[in-house]
From Swiss-Prot:
The gene is serS. GO terms for biological process: selenocysteine biosynthetic process; seryl-tRNA aminoacylation. Homodimer. The tRNA molecule binds across the dimer. Catalyzes the attachment of serine to tRNA(Ser). Is also able to aminoacylate tRNA(Sec) with serine, to form the misacylated tRNA L-seryl-tRNA(Sec), which will be further converted into selenocysteinyl-tRNA(Sec). It comes from Fervidobacterium nodosum (strain ATCC 35602 / DSM 5306 / Rt17-B1). Consists of two distinct domains, a catalytic core and a N-terminal extension that is involved in tRNA binding. Pathway: Aminoacyl-tRNA biosynthesis; selenocysteinyl-tRNA(Sec) biosynthesis; L-seryl-tRNA(Sec) from L-serine and tRNA(Sec): step 1/1. The keyword ATP-binding applies. This is Serine--tRNA ligase.
Length: 426
């Protein structure tokens, strides 16, 4: 959530931020107008309270002078003023709730280092690692490789659950498990604390992390219990410390979790709906940091490098791009996308988004830290995929495929697999 005090003080800052993101600024006008009305109510309340205080002094004087009847008349008048104050304060509370609810729809202002652009075509590439493999045969897409191996079954997934669900068998199922274990092992060696989190969360939890109310249509819900299936472990990890005060000397806190993720993906279309790229249910290893404002953008660089390290160890070519203002996620102040090379697309495809959310989630969740000087400040939260398991599986299948349809297993995964090659199921 944005800082409403800052909006009151400098609405122009938010006008400019929303324009950079290609958002309508009407919501800022609504809040500014509500704030004017709130201030007007506040002035009325303050004047009434001042009048009531004067009457209280008058009552004391009349009683001291023995003028009890006059004192009772003033007390009656003071009571009426108290009722008026309660009415105006009730209106103030209603206005505060309206402003708060509107503010939930305002995205995080982009950081000054984020390039201004209208959409993903204006994202800025900042580095590459590795070279795409030059095949001496016609490579196959994973949606052909997997069924030919007898290990990816899209038809049975559809039969069980509908479109964009998949059943995995044999070595491919084991490889997906191995990828997750490998990622967790690397991240925990790098100082992350592994966390096993709930996959169902309360409405206030998923509101705190920014998915609600704006993205309600993208979420799977359990209406009877008012619970939501997590679209990412970020939700559970970034809400772990709701209503808590952390100590600065214990920051940063670095968490990692492996969970299934559930997304309706209502707006997806085209080539992405084939295979494993855009599923309703997929697995992911998530990275989340709690840190201080002074170091959060420096920490974002480290978090991104931690995600990149997985691809380097797997020997998968990738590039890193900075998202422009028009492509930035709702809660993010700055985001790096890591894109892995996929032969089936003949291009790079997102496998991780690493973001600094600044204090956007912390304000919603009331997550603060006590600084060394004793002051309480909101933490900054960072998040990133470390990595998406399904897309990593796809990248391995396509980049490590052989002419005979077998798949060579990357060296770092062989201890987890107990073999160096995946052959068709018998």
């Amino acid at each position: 959530m944005i800082d409403l005090k800052l909006l009151r003080k400098d609405p122009q800052h938010f006008y400019e931020a929303l324009k950079k993101r290609n958002y309508s600024t009407d919501i800022i006008d609504e809040i500014v107008n509500l704030d004017k009305e709130w201030r007007n109510q506040l002035n009325i309340v303050n004047n009434l309270k001042a009048k009531r205080n004067e009457l209280s002094k008058l009552v004391a004087r009349y009683k001291a002078e023995g003028k009890n009847q006059e004192a009772e008349e003033i007390i009656a008048e003071s009571k009426k003023i108290g009722e008026e104050i309660a009415q105006y304060e009730g209106k103030q509370k209603e206005l505060e709730e309206k402003m708060y609810n509107l503010a939930l729809y305002i995205p995080n202002p982009p950081h000054e280092s984020v390039p201004v652009g209208k959409d993903e075509t204006e994202n800025v590439e900042i580095r590459r690692w590795g070279e795409p493999r030059k095949f001496d045969f016609e490579p196959k897409a994973h949606w052909d490789l997997g069924p030919e191996l007898g290990m990816l079954d899209f038809d049975r997934g559809s039969k069980l659950s509908g479109s964009r669900f998949t059943v995995m068998f044999g070595a491919i199922a084991k490889l997906e498990r191995a990828i997750a274990q490998f990622m967790l092992d690397v991240h925990t060696k790098n100082g992350y604390i592994e966390v096993n989190v709930p996959h169902l969360v309360k409405r206030e939890t998923i509101t705190a992390t920014g998915q609600l109310p704006k993205f309600s249509e993208e979420l799977y819900t359990c209406e009877r219990d008012d619970l939501f299936l997590i679209p990412t472990a970020e939700v559970s990890l970034a809400a772990l410390h709701i209503d808590e005060i952390l100590e600065e000397n214990k920051l940063p806190k670095k968490y990692t979790a492996f969970t299934p993720c559930y997304r309706r993906e209502a707006g997806s279309y085209g080539k992405d709906v084939r295979g494993l790229i855009r599923q309703h249910q997929f697995e992911k290893v998530e990275l989340v940091w709690y840190t201080t404002p002074e170091r959060s953008f420096e920490d974002l660089e480290q978090l991104t490098q931690d995600a990149e390290r997985i691809l380097q160890l797997l020997g998968l070519p990738y590039r890193v791009v900075t998202l422009c203002t028009g492509d930035l996620g709702f809660a993010a102040a700055k985001t790096y996308d890591i894109e892995v090379w996929l032969p089936s697309y003949n291009s790079y495809k997102e496998i991780s988004s690493c973001s600094n959310v600044t204090d956007f989630q912390a304000r919603r969740g009331n997550i603060r830290y006590r600084a060394k000087d004793g002051k309480l400040n909101y933490v900054h939260t960072l998040n990133g995929s470390g990595l998406a398991i399904g897309r990593t599986l796809v990248a391995i299948m396509e980049n490590y495929q052989n002419p005979d349809g077998t798949i060579t297993i990357p060296e770092v995964l062989r201890p987890y697999m107990g073999t160096d090659i995946i052959k068709p199921m018998e």
